[in-house]
Amino acid sequence: MAPEVLPKPRMRGLLARRLRNHMAVAFVLSLGVAALYKFRVADQRKKAYADFYRNYDVMKDFEEMRKAGIFQSVK
């Protein structure tokens, strides 16, 4: 019996094939992470800022700081 011969591996274009596959996976993963960040972090942060400034009174905050003595030029 003759020993079984293994087929030769395809070496031509090996790096290009692997890079193409890995680039596609990296692109899809980066889009997923960007979407996840937008919905989990950015939108909640934007909502928190909007809620804060909806009820924020500048003059009330200024008067509290003035009474606490933070400003040197305002008596």
From Swiss-Prot:
Subcellular localization, as worded in the UniProt entry: Mitochondrion inner membrane
Side Mitochondrial matrix, residues: 1-13
Membrane-topology descriptor: Single-pass membrane protein
Keyword terms of this UniProt record: Membrane, Mitochondrion, Mitochondrion inner membrane, Transmembrane, Transmembrane helix
A GO cellular component entry from the record: mitochondrion
Coiled-coil regions listed: none
Pathway note: Energy metabolism; oxidative phosphorylation
CDD domains to which the protein is assigned, alphabetical: CcO_VIc
Transmembrane segments annotated in the record for this chain: 14-54
GO biological process: cellular respiration; generation of precursor metabolites and energy; mitochondrial electron transport, cytochrome c to oxygen
Mitochondrial intermembrane side: 55-75
Annotated family: Belongs to the cytochrome c oxidase subunit 6c family.
Subunit-level organization: Component of the cytochrome c oxidase (complex IV, CIV), a multisubunit enzyme composed of 14 subunits. The complex is composed of a catalytic core of 3 subunits MT-CO1, MT-CO2 and MT-CO3, encoded in the mitochondrial DNA, and 11 supernumerary subunits COX4I1 (or COX4I2), COX5A, COX5B, COX6A1 (or COX6A2), COX6B1 (or COX6B2), COX6C, COX7A2 (or COX7A1), COX7B, COX7C, COX8A and NDUFA4, which are encoded in the nuclear genome.
Summary of the function given for this chain in its UniProt record: Component of the cytochrome c oxidase, the last enzyme in the mitochondrial electron transport chain which drives oxidative phosphorylation. The respiratory chain contains 3 multisubunit complexes succinate dehydrogenase (complex II, CII), ubiquinol-cytochrome c oxidoreductase (cytochrome b-c1 complex, complex III, CIII) and cytochrome c oxidase (complex IV, CIV), that cooperate to transfer electrons derived from NADH and succinate to molecular oxygen, creating an electrochemical gradient over the inner membrane that drives transmembrane transport and the ATP synthase.
PANTHER family xref list: CYTOCHROME C OXIDASE SUBUNIT 6C (PTHR48416:SF1)
Protein name stated in the entry: Cytochrome c oxidase subunit 6C
Species name: Homo sapiens (Human)
